[in-house]
């Protein structure tokens, strides 16, 4: 490319970034992808790597959608657990009225400190979310789910009444209000969403998410989560194999995907990921069925290796640190300085 065109392109890119914010446009191979965005881990090592910044970005809107029982709420509860481990505060706006505190506790959530709201209407749910964001004291706000945000007019109306586009208008208005507050308070807001089928679609994907198009536009990250298989121990099913696609990502290159296991009553199998990614990266050696690290055998078969790492958390931490160093961009000195100044 000649010099004049290069200058014109860099001027255009600069103008786009000034007008629409950092990350509005980037080169696909750009590994420096907005390094200074703070992130909260998802609880899955593979997904943190696929997201490019080590987790979900703070000060942004995130949408997680998928079919029923695909792991949407499990993933968000893991994010809450990770946030609390870092000393953060989390809130769960339970529009579905289906949060199970016992299950949340098993995933590592401190339910005593978790703020929970079970609103009556969609307007109330989004107003509560907005007030929590504006307080500036909450790190993560989860809305479960967009499909359950029922407009007040629909609740007060008769069962057969048609309320066309009410929910979409509600979401559009709420997100217009929320976005600026979210950026200012540096809060991560996660909307869980369900899938619906478009009628009469002959070609292309008939699936769509509820609540209109506003959330698709306002979300910086959109995750499509699917169950791909079952994990069995003998005849007993002990968990799900899960795949997450990063459908949209404004803070790093998109379209990456992560595969991990969700074990019933335990959540995302972090140690299983450490072993799998460690083998891919050559950090953990696999010879036949045996796994070894630094010449030391850690188990025959993945289950035994996982048990060994559970008993030796310092070794698991060391392997995970090496994996993160290899895949995730190093934080810039400027971001570290800002963080230490805040502390």
Curated annotation (Swiss-Prot):
Gene3D superfamilies referenced in this protein's UniProt entry, alphabetically: P-loop containing nucleotide triphosphate hydrolases
SUPFAM superfamilies, A to Z: P-loop containing nucleoside triphosphate hydrolases, RecA protein, C-terminal domain
Keywords: ATP-binding, Cytoplasm, DNA damage, DNA recombination, DNA repair, DNA-binding, Nucleotide-binding, SOS response
CC terms in the record's Gene Ontology section: cytosol
Gene Ontology BP terms: DNA recombination; DNA repair; SOS response
Subcellular location: Cytoplasm
Annotated spans, Disordered: 319-343
Top-level taxonomic group: Bacteria
Pfam families membership: RecA, RecA_C
Main location: cytoplasm
Family, per entry: Belongs to the RecA family.
Annotated protein name in UniProt: Protein RecA
Source organism of the structure: Thioalkalivibrio sulfidiphilus (strain HL-EbGR7)
């Amino acid at each position: 490319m000649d010099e004049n065109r290069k200058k014109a392109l860099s001027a255009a890119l600069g103008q786009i970034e000034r007008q629409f914010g950092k990350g509005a446009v980037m080169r696909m191979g750009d590994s420096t992808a907005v390094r200074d965005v703070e992130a909260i881990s998802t609880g899955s090592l593979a997904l943190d790597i696929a997201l490019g910044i080590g987790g979900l970005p703070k000060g942004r809107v995130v949408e997680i959608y998928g079919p029923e029982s695909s792991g949407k709420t499990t993933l968000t509860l893991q994010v809450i657990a990770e946030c609390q481990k870092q000393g953060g505060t989390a809130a769960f706006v339970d529009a579905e009225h289906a949060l199970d505190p016992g299950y949340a506790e098993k995933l590592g959530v401190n339910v005593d400190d978790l703020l929970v709201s079970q609103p009556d209407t969609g307007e109330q749910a989004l107003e509560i979310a907005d007030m929590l964001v504006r307080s500036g004291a909450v790190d993560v706000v989860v809305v479960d789910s967009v499909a359950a945000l029922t407009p007040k007019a629909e609740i007060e109306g008769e069962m057969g009444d048609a309320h066309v586009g009410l929910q979409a208008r509600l979401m559009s208005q709420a997100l217009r209000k929320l976005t600026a507050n979210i950026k200012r308070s540096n809060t991560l807001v996660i909307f869980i969403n369900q899938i619906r089928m478009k009628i009469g679609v002959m070609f292309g994907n008939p699936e769509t998410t509820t609540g209109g198009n506003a959330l698709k536009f306002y979300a910086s990250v959109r995750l499509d989560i699917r169950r791909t298989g079952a994990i069995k121990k003998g005849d007993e099913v002990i968990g799900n194999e899960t795949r997450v696609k990063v459908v949209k990502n404004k803070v790093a290159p998109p379209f990456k995907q992560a595969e991990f296991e969700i074990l019933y009553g335990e959540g995302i199998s972090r140690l299983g990921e450490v072993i799998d990614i460690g083998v891919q990266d050559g950090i953990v050696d696999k010879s036949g069925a045996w796994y070894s690290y630094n010449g030391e055998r850690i188990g025959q078969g993945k289950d035994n290796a996982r048990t060994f790492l559970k008993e030796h958390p310092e070794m698991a931490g060391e392997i995970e640190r090496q994996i993160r160093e290899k895949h995730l961009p190093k934080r810039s000195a400027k971001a570290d300085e800002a963080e230490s100044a805040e502390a």
